[in-house]
Swiss-Prot record:
Binding partners and assembly: Part of the 30S ribosomal subunit.
Record's protein name: Small ribosomal subunit protein uS17
UniProt KW Oxidoreductase keyword: no
Species of the source: Leuconostoc mesenteroides subsp. mesenteroides (strain ATCC 8293 / DSM 20343 / BCRC 11652 / CCM 1803 / JCM 6124 / NCDO 523 / NBRC 100496 / NCIMB 8023 / NCTC 12954 / NRRL B-1118 / 37Y)
CDD domains, per database record: Ribosomal_uS17
An individual GO BP term: translation
Gene: rpsQ
Function: One of the primary rRNA binding proteins, it binds specifically to the 5'-end of 16S ribosomal RNA.
The entry's keywords: Ribonucleoprotein, Ribosomal protein, RNA-binding, rRNA-binding
Amino acid sequence: MSEERNTRKVYQGRVVSDKMNKTITVAVDTYLTHDVYGKRVKYTKKFKAHDENNAAKQGDIVQIMETRPLSATKHFRLVKIVEEAVIL
């Protein structure tokens, strides 16, 4: 009996907080077109993600994937760091 795994959501966003141990907060921007006016509206949603090695820093662009619940608010894990933040 072969069981197929469900497709998991993968998001790309910016790390807005890395103050917690092994946890990052990622802001994901989504653009939707308004039904009546046709204007693109930007929505931002924040997700907490598991970062096992504390590799991601604030300002990094990261990719996160849906996973089993790791805590009350953490349902994503870090897949990879797409772009590191530039420190001026």
